[in-house]
C-alpha cells in the first residue's frame, strides 16, 4: 500500500519538475481510481470493524484485495468468511465487484459466492444502491453487517436458505454450523 502511495507522491513531485509533455505522460500512469484508493484504503484501515481483516496480495494493486469477516455473534459466529473485492477502472461511478470465496449457507449469499447487498448494485429500486459518495469503507461495513443486522430472510438471493430458516430455524442453524465446520475455519 505504501508503495503505490509513494509512487503517486513521486508522480506529483515529477509534475513540478518536468515539461508539460512529460508530465501528461507521467500522470496517465495512475487512474483516478488508483488515486482515490490511496485515500480510501487508509480510511478503511483506520475504521475497520474489529471482526474484519483486509489483505492486499500485491501492495501495488489496491484495486484487488481480500476481506475476512469473522462474526462474533449470531448464526455465523466462529466462522471466517473470505471475500474477494475488485475495484473496476470506472470506480467510483460504479461499485466494486465482490465475491464470497467461502461456501456458506446464507439467505443473501449464494453457495457460488454471489452477494445480495443493495450498495453493491449500480441501480437499486429502493435508492440504496451505489452512489459516487460511497467508499470502500461502506462496502466492508455492509459485508460485515450481512452476518448481523443486514441478514435478510425476506428478500433473499438464496431462496432455499431463506425458506429453510423460515420452516425450521434449528435445522437451519445446524446446516450453517456444518458449513462453518467444513468451509469456514
From Swiss-Prot:
InterPro entries: UBQ-conjugat_E2_core, UBQ-conjugating_AS, UBQ-conjugating_enzyme/RWD. Keywords: Acetylation, ATP-binding, Nucleotide-binding, Transferase, Ubl conjugation pathway. Accepts the ubiquitin-like protein NEDD8 from the UBA3-NAE1 E1 complex and catalyzes its covalent attachment to other proteins. Together with the E3 ubiquitin ligase RNF7/RBX2, specifically neddylates cullin-5 (CUL5). Does not neddylate CUL1, CUL2, CUL3, CUL4A or CUL4B. Mediates neddylation of the CUL9-RBX1 complex. Disulfide bonds: none annotated. The acetylation of Met-1 increases affinity for DCUN1D3 by about 2 orders of magnitude and is crucial for NEDD8 transfer to cullins. One of its GO terms (biological process) is protein neddylation. Its EC number is 2.3.2.34. Pathway: Protein modification; protein neddylation. Belongs to the ubiquitin-conjugating enzyme family. UBE2F subfamily. It comes from the Eukaryota. Interacts with UBA3 and RBX2. Interacts (N-terminally acetylated form) with (via DCUN1 domain) DCUN1D1, DCUN1D2, DCUN1D3, DCUN1D4 and DCUN1D5. Residues 32-185 form the UBC core domain. This is NEDD8-conjugating enzyme UBE2F-B. PANTHER family: UBIQUITIN-CONJUGATING ENZYME E2. The active site is at 116 (glycyl thioester intermediate). The keyword Hydrolase does not apply. One of its GO terms (molecular function) is ATP binding. It catalyses: [E1 NEDD8-activating enzyme]-S-[NEDD8 protein]-yl-L-cysteine + [E2 NEDD8-conjugating enzyme]-L-cysteine = [E1 NEDD8-activating enzyme]-L-cysteine + [E2 NEDD8-conjugating enzyme]-S-[NEDD8-protein]-yl-L-cysteine. It holds the Pfam family UQ_con.
Amino acid at each position: 500500500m505504501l508503495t503505490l502511495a509513494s509512487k503517486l507522491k513521486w508522480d506529483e513531485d515529477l509534475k513540478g519538475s518536468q515539461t508539460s509533455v512529460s508530465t501528461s505522460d507521467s500522470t496517465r500512469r495512475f487512474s483516478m481510481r488508483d488515486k482515490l484508493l490511496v485515500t480510501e484504503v487508509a480510511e478503511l484501515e483506520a475504521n475497520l470493524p474489529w471482526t474484519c481483516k483486509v489483505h492486499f496480495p500485491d501492495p501495488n494493486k489496491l484495486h484487488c484485495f481480500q476481506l475476512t469477516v469473522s462474526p462474533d455473534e449470531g448464526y455465523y459466529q466462529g466462522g471466517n468468511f473470505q471475500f474477494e473485492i475488485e475495484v473496476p477502472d470506472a470506480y467510483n461511478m460504479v461499485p466494486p465487484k465482490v465475491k464470497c470465496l467461502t461456501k456458506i449457507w446464507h439467505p443473501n449469499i449464494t453457495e457460488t459466492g454471489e452477494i445480495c447487498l443493495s450498495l453493491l448494485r449500480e441501480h437499486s429500486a429502493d435508492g440504496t444502491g451505489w452512489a459516487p459518495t460511497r467508499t470502500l469503507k461502506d462496502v466492508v461495513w455492509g459485508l460485515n453487517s450481512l452476518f448481523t443486522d443486514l441478514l435478510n430472510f425476506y428478500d433473499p438471493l438464496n431462496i432455499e436458505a431463506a425458506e429453510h430458516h423460515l420452516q425450521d430455524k434449528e435445522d437451519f442453524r445446524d446446516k450453517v454450523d456444518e458449513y462453518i465446520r467444513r468451509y469456514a475455519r
